[in-house]
């Protein structure tokens, strides 16, 4: 049975016959720490780290989407009239899906290529033998996996296939923004009412196509729910860190909205 059929990662070799290099360089099973699954350097194709082919262009487009998101929030009186602390919490909880909707609305496309990963042997040979904790080099910045980026692209393509109009995008953003389930809200009941209003407005936009609009509404809401499963860390690692470094997007949005 092949490794792919048995569920064993091909890059790790057979479970009973590890590679010679792996045997020589690996400590005993009791002392070897488990690598986090999200950051393991698995050589399987779907888990290989990738990076943008055109980071400066894509990052510029991503920042433009953030700017349009801020403009959308500024022009939304129902959001601006909320307590500042509630605005901050809503931003922290929903900036990722709002940003993804902005990418979809602006039809932002991008390509990725495999990121170079130094071999274990190269790392060992280049490491200073007497380097302590103070002289150790900082770890390489995290890179998104191919599988995660492909899922993100699939979600964007699904939204493009729906061919949403500006009003549909606006009201859908409202249903995502006004999330009463965000912890720590002071006006959660009012925010729940705002979310319901945005949902009704979205239904009214689709009403001329009734009864076919019922299926369209279900598809729109289903696709919107998938956006919440895309990690904000992935968005930062892919679109922003390669050019502008480590940045807290929530704080950046707060600065742009003059909430800080």
UniProtKB/Swiss-Prot annotation:
Protein name, as recorded: Nuclear receptor subfamily 0 group B member 2
Tissue expression remark: Detected in kidney, testis, heart and liver.
InterPro entries: NHR-like_dom_sf, NR0B1/2, Nucl_hrmn_rcpt_lig-bd, Nuclear_hrmn_rcpt
Chain's role: Transcriptional regulator that acts as a negative regulator of receptor-dependent signaling pathways. Specifically inhibits transactivation of the nuclear receptor with which it interacts. Inhibits transcriptional activity of NEUROD1 on E-box-containing promoter by interfering with the coactivation function of the p300/CBP-mediated transcription complex for NEUROD1. Essential component of the liver circadian clock which via its interaction with NR1D1 and RORG regulates NPAS2-mediated hepatic lipid metabolism. Regulates the circadian expression of cytochrome P450 (CYP) enzymes.
Post-translational modification: Arginine methylation by PRMT5 enhances repression activity of metabolic genes in liver in response to bile acid signaling, by increasing interaction with cofactors.
Subcellular location(s) per record: Cytoplasm; Nucleus
Residues where Symmetric dimethylarginine is found: 57
Entries under SMART domains matching the protein: HOLI
Organism: Rattus norvegicus (Rat)
